[in-house]
Amino acid sequence: MEAPEVPVGSLIDFETEPPTSPPLEAAPSTLQDPDGSLGDGASESETTESADSENDMGESPSHPSWDQDRRSSSNESFSSNQSADSAPDEETLALREFMRSYVEKIFSGGEDLDQEEKAKFGEYCSGEDGKGREWFARFVSAQRCKSKCVSEPTFYRLVQSFAVVLFECHQMDDFGPAKNLMTMCFTYYHLGKPQLPPTEPREKPAGSIDSYLKSANSWLAEKKDIAERLLKNTENMKGFFGGLETKLKGPLVRKNEEDENKPKDRQTKTVTMISPEDEQKGEKVYLYTHLRQQPIWHTLRFWNAAFFDAVHCERRKRSPTTRGDAGEQEEKREKWCHMTQEERDDSLRFNENITFGQLGTFTHNMLAFGLNKKLCSDFLKKQAVIGNLDEEQYKLLSDHIEQMATE
């Protein structure tokens, strides 16, 4: 594929023109809060978490560089770029403090949320300015620095709160908080009881993110269990060491012992065994398994807008020309005409790798949310052309979609 000498963002069709946002002003230090600032929290998996999970929330809301970056990309992203960082007033401070307290109660797992708090939460999340949705997404993302594994009560509180916010995001076409909550859907989990029907074979796919690891652990546990039973069971132990006593008995006794051993052999082939550690830990149940029916996931406009924003933020975060010395030199290096041929090749390769990684993440998430294979393939084809991926990269992603669709 020939590399187009135009920015990626100008080719993406959002189907509706995003409203222009007024210039943003950095909030005073009164809005500064440790919970609003996120560190480089590691993702659960490179294949399950978008690489831009730290994009909008990697810095404090009042940080100058955050405000500058948001200002420069406000017309290139989507409508959710209306920031919660406007001039502080009593209403803004009250909203922010409420969302902080609300999220803390969700993750504490102790104090219950009363009906008044739930009603106020719904009111804030339905605001047209999107501040309530944005602050909720930020505070939820900040909690992952503490722990990604949550208790069962916290898990279902998150499911209910996510459902409210995602519905309002769909109604308002507010794709920013929805994109960040999409990442959180593959981050937070609780440990459920492993479901192991005795009649199903071990080879049946587990249908979860950790299916490959669990199948390997199950195989090892099965072999360990067989060895333990050989040592504990008297008859098996005699057979294991040569069956000396069996040879002294008559053919009838030997026949009875063979009949007893046959069902046991069949059982070891059909029952999935798990290690004691897995029994204690249980199976990871992620938020996305309970939020597949949210209408925003089935809107292609969301995926186009979210993908563009993810690629844009990843380039801005990783590019050595945008995170080093600012000023005229940066502007010159950003212009294609001022780049050497080697710099152009490196820039193209750099952008292709980012697009490839984000497409792998997004197509995985789309399939996990229940989108059909054709829709995912069409999305991949469109973005691969825009991102100038080569045939090998495109084939790898296509094969990944086929593999996940069959599973």
From Swiss-Prot:
Domain of life of the organism encoding this protein: Eukaryota
| Region described as Disordered | 1-90
Where, per the database record, does this protein carry Phosphoserine? 275
Keyword rRNA processing in the entry? The reply is no
State where composition is biased (Low complexity). Answer: 74-86
InterPro entries registered for this protein in UniProt: KIAA0513, SBF1/SBF2
Protein's recorded name: Uncharacterized protein KIAA0513
Taxonomic lineage per UniProt? Eukaryota, Metazoa, Chordata, Craniata, Vertebrata
Ordered alphabetically, the record's keywords are: Phosphoprotein
Which spans does this entry mark as compositional bias, Acidic residues?
46-57
Native source species = Mus musculus
